């Protein structure tokens, strides 16, 4: 019985990155032996055990055989005669197929160390095509290690295209797809994840609403990058620079879905695209089972981002109506999220990357003015029932109007 450290821990150690989780591989043991040693079995489909003291995962060496569609369509064979190399052979990428024994010796039958040094994401074997989840995993690794200079091997990208052209991606569950998206949204370069999916053909299958944006033109005056799909990924990249909030990043990704529905005769203009995108966002979020809070922010950003961009031109009544509709009174953090997504939208354009966004501070101050209206004073003045809400609304509008008048000389555009 031999125990090896495998997978991400070995890879990240070689890259001098922090190690989050440690996974161990056990060669030459049976489930009965593991149980006798005090390990607790947790794997149903294949033998995975938790260490009796530190609760880390120890998996018995195994081989896999494809028997059906999807990432779950495998028959696993675990026995003491499965070798270290046989187990490593079933892994996705060479950089994840390196093992380290208890003395620190490295075992690298598929040249993963060489690929780490070459900054190359390369598949271990042609069995790569048997698991469609690997398309998303490789895209995520490309995004995660983008700053280190990693790129996908041409032959691996070809296999990813092969998977995308088959029916295999459709066999992935919504939960697994969203899990990979969620992990990528939390990384430093989520835009690379979607760039890779676009390159290999998976974006069209899994995210048709986003795929439809590529090739859709925008006015060159405001969008020197022209292509809406390119703009979308630039906005996502800017959102990642602005905040670690994954909901804001997702909202940035889907804020312009409605542009794909603009009539061809109206291009490159996109009137009402924010509202047109709402059903598309709802459909995407329902299909992928996106968390409700993330979905709701995405809908808010799509619906209101044009108003936020034009904040200086809005009447006080309109501003308060937006605050009401978004329920900022109870959820003031959503205003911050909305503004962050709008900053990303503004900066996600060629040549606009470092521009200021005074609309954000302006709307924040409008909200503070409106939110400072004293409800107790309204009640004390004798208002009752529905009158209270009406009086509150009027006083909030008046508060915003007074702030606007005070700011009149400082505004970049005329107030009409």
UniProtKB/Swiss-Prot annotation:
Annotated HD domain ranges read 228-329
One GO-annotated biological process of the protein: RNA repair
Report the transmembrane regions from the record.
none
Which cofactors, by name? Mg(2+); Ni(2+)
PROSITE patterns associated with the record: HD
| Amino acids binding CTP | 8, 11, 91, 137, 140
Pfam families this protein is in?
Answer: HD (PF01966), PolyA_pol (PF01743), PolyA_pol_RNAbd (PF12627)
Binding sites annotated in the UniProt record for Mg(2+)? 21, 23
Record keyword tRNA processing present: yes
State the Gene Ontology terms under molecular function: ATP binding; CCA tRNA nucleotidyltransferase activity; cyclic-nucleotide phosphodiesterase activity; magnesium ion binding; phosphatase activity; tRNA binding
Which keywords appear in this protein's UniProt record, sorted alphabetically?
ATP-binding, Hydrolase, Magnesium, Metal-binding, Multifunctional enzyme, Nickel, Nucleotide-binding, Nucleotidyltransferase, RNA repair, RNA-binding, Transferase, tRNA processing
The residues the record assigns to binding ATP are: 8, 11, 91, 137, 140
Q: Which reaction does it catalyse?
A: a tRNA precursor + 2 CTP + ATP = a tRNA with a 3' CCA end + 3 diphosphate; a tRNA with a 3' CCA end + 2 CTP + ATP = a tRNA with a 3' CCACCA end + 3 diphosphate
Other facts: A single active site specifically recognizes both ATP and CTP and is responsible for their addition.
The role this protein plays is:
Catalyzes the addition and repair of the essential 3'-terminal CCA sequence in tRNAs without using a nucleic acid template. Adds these three nucleotides in the order of C, C, and A to the tRNA nucleotide-73, using CTP and ATP as substrates and producing inorganic pyrophosphate. tRNA 3'-terminal CCA addition is required both for tRNA processing and repair. Also involved in tRNA surveillance by mediating tandem CCA addition to generate a CCACCA at the 3' terminus of unstable tRNAs. While stable tRNAs receive only 3'-terminal CCA, unstable tRNAs are marked with CCACCA and rapidly degraded.
Quote the record's domain comment. Comprises two domains: an N-terminal domain containing the nucleotidyltransferase activity and a C-terminal HD domain associated with both phosphodiesterase and phosphatase activities.
Subunit details for this protein? Answer: Monomer. Can also form homodimers and oligomers.
Q: What does the similarity note say?
A: Belongs to the tRNA nucleotidyltransferase/poly(A) polymerase family. Bacterial CCA-adding enzyme type 1 subfamily.
- NCBIfam families reported in the protein's UniProt record: PRK10885.1
What protein am I looking at?
Multifunctional CCA protein
Q: Which organism is it from?
A: Shewanella baltica (strain OS155 / ATCC BAA-1091)
Question: Taxonomically, what lineage is the organism?
Answer: Bacteria, Pseudomonadati, Pseudomonadota, Gammaproteobacteria, Alteromonadales
Q: Which gene encodes it?
A: cca
